[in-house]
């Protein structure tokens, strides 16, 4: 297969939805950063600010029944899988009402009814699990596919290549999406892997790969939709490398001194949220007043999430002894 340019273009309603989705993710993550600084969120916390176009496009072309699994930078993925932000924030704040009962925290978010299978703290560990999810779909004879997200740092993990081999050998319906934000913690791609074209990493297993601009919602929408169609129709894996960028450090404890302010500002000039807003206004898909109303509704969602989380109880002590399997 090949990705045809502009085969699919979002319609008016999808542009507006993408703006609302990305704005919600941006404001949610900003609030998480604020609450972390206030000591109300503990442990590790990895923000998704800057990368919103990736999951926004994928979530839009997903079909009911498809599954999602990702790494520890997972807040955005679970929200667009269908989990209400208040349950996600409650989990980050360690409350019993959280999506993982307050025991998972930022890196281990789960929502099985919405087929979101984590949130995994071990680099690359989600890839063989996602491959197993795709195996289950094929075994059960469904027409569902699995979207497995990983970072550029995970592509050097041995288990990733074992998963690639199994997926191609058994013809599994899975899309591996490499979110290449240029740094695995503080190490650039060029310093950690010999072949920097990460979409080619599956070639020895017969897996086609494609590279998309993860800062461009329209390109993400068009490319991901074509790839998903191919995987669904042919039950065979595809690798998507999406070139994106995180505006914040690797985690809340990372000052990101390994990159210059000029580099960060260069990417912010292409901010996907600003671009989508411009497209909507230029094409008269909505008015400035309409977008301000969306902004107000997002503020209300965040406010409700904070109030719900702060008023929720901590887990009962006996929860320490549940869901222990080893």
Swiss-Prot record:
Keyword Transmembrane helix on entry: no
Enzyme class, UniProt record, top EC level: oxidoreductase
Entry EC no(s): 1.2.4.1
Transmembrane residue ranges: none
Keyword match DNA repair: no
Function: The pyruvate dehydrogenase complex catalyzes the overall conversion of pyruvate to acetyl-CoA and CO(2). It contains multiple copies of three enzymatic components: pyruvate dehydrogenase (E1), dihydrolipoamide acetyltransferase (E2) and lipoamide dehydrogenase (E3).
Name of this protein: Pyruvate dehydrogenase E1 component subunit alpha
């Amino acid at each position: 297969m090949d990705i045809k340019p502009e085969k699919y273009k979002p319609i008016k309603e999808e542009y507006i939805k993408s703006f609302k989705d990305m704005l919600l993710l941006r404001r949610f993550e900003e609030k998480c950063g604020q609450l972390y600084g206030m000591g109300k969120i503990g442990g590790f916390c990895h923000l998704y600010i800057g990368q919103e176009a990736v999951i926004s496009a994928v979530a839009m072309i997903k079909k009911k029944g498809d599954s999602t699994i990702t790494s520890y930078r997972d807040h955005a993925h679970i929200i667009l899988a269908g989990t209400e932000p208040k349950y996600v924030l409650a989990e980050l704040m360690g409350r019993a009402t959280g999506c993982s009962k307050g025991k998972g925290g930022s890196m281990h978010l789960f929502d099985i009814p919405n087929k979101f299978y984590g949130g995994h703290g071990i680099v690359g560990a989600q890839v063989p699990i996602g491959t197993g999810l795709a195996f289950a779909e094929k075994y059960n004879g469904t027409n569902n596919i699995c979207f497995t997200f990983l970072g550029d740092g995970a592509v050097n993990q041995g288990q990733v290549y074992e998963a690639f081999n199994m997926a191609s050998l058994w013809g599994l319906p899975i899309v591996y999406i490499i979110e290449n934000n240029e740094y695995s913690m503080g190490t650039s791609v060029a310093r950690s892997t010999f072949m920097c074209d990460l979409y080619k990493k599956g070639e020895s297993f017969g897996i086609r790969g494609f590279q998309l601009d993860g800062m461009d919602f329209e390109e993400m929408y068009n490319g991901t939709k074509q790839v998903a169609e191919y995987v669904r129709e042919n039950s065979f894996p595809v690798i998507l490398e999406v070139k994106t960028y995180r505006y914040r450090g690797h985690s809340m404890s990372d000052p990101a001194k390994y990159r210059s302010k000029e580099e960060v500002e260069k990417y912010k000039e292409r901010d996907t949220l600003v671009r989508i807003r411009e497209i909507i206004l230029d094409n008269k898909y909505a008015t400035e007043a309409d977008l301000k109303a969306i902004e107000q509704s997002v503020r209300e969602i965040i406010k409700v999430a904070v109030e719900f989380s702060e008023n929720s109880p901590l887990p009962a002590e006996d929860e320490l002894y549940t869901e222990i399997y080893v």
